[in-house]
Every structure is written in structure tokens, then in C-alpha cells.
Amino acid sequence: MFAVRVGLQKFNIAHKFEIASIITLYANWIREGKLKVNSDWNKERQIKFTVQDPCQLVRKTFGDPMAEDLRYVTKAVVGEENFIDMTPNRSNNYCCGGGGGFLQNGMPEARRAFGKLKADQIKATGATYCITPCHNCHAQIHDLSEHYEGGWHNVHLWTLICLSMGILGENEREYLGDDLKEMDVLFNREEDVST
């Protein structure tokens, strides 16, 4: 989105469309009652979540309103009491160290060293899961957890939306920990599909 937005501005390209993130759409749909999520599944479990504010999405493109939408959706699906924010956060959040091509550049030691600050930041929250709405952040933060033995799982926002709606499919459980991987939700069993 950042490249499209900057490209349109830089080359003064006329357009009749609005650039929006799926996160803002999720937030709007939840506010309007079109996306019916809830956090009941996590009331007793009390699994803690934090979020990564992607540089390209928050700081460089949409700013803190995007970060607020991300938190709104997260709290709606995991419960406000189960959300732990990183410090610093929003537009001031630390870079994960995997963006700008660094993830694919073949220098994992340097990438991990740069990402150590992010790993320590996530660890400090005590959260079991880090929600990563950016592909590069997702891959980097997953690697950081394994490399630095962080103990957290990282997960896509969509996975938690599906879980909160009771429609989490078998193929959407790859990044979940054992605490959620086997969670029994609608359409998880054959008898659910037939009813």
C-alpha cells in the first residue's frame, strides 16, 4: 500500500479509488455489525496477545489511526482484558527488522541482531501471541521467537477473527500454539458440517 500511495503522489497519477487496509475494513465491519466477532472463547482461557505495528502500514502510510483500528479489532476478538500493548507502540513501535528486503537478503545473523530489540520488546509484554498483520513482520517475528527462544507464537489477524467467529478451518491452525490448535470450533468436526 505504501508503494502504491507514494507512486500515485510522486508521479501525480489521477485515480478514483481510495487506498485502504483490510484492517480498517475489518474495524468498520465490526463497528457496523457486519462482521460478527466476539471474545467469549478467551474469557476463561485468558490467553494474552500483543500486536506488531508494521512500519509500512502504520508509520509510513496510515499513521496512528491504523494502529487504533488494529487494536480495536484485536480487543474485539481476544478481549480487552487479554490485550497487552508493547512499549513503545503505534507510530513509535520498534521495527521488527525484517522489512525493506532485509528478510530476503541472505544475512540472517544481521537481521536477527537488528530484530533483538523487537524480540526483547515482545518478551517484555509476557504475551503468548504476537499478532502480525504484515507478511514480513510475520516471518521475522516467527524467526525471532525461535532464534531467541521467545516462547511466543505469532499469528495473523484473520486467524483470530475466524476463531472468534467459530469458523477456524483445519488449514488455518499452522501458527497456533497447542493452547488453541485443537480448539473445537464450528466446522471443525464432520458432524458440524452436516447440520
Walk through the language-model features, giving the residues of each.
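Iron-sulfur cluster-binding electron-transfer modules in prokaryotic oxidoreductases
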Residues: M1-T195
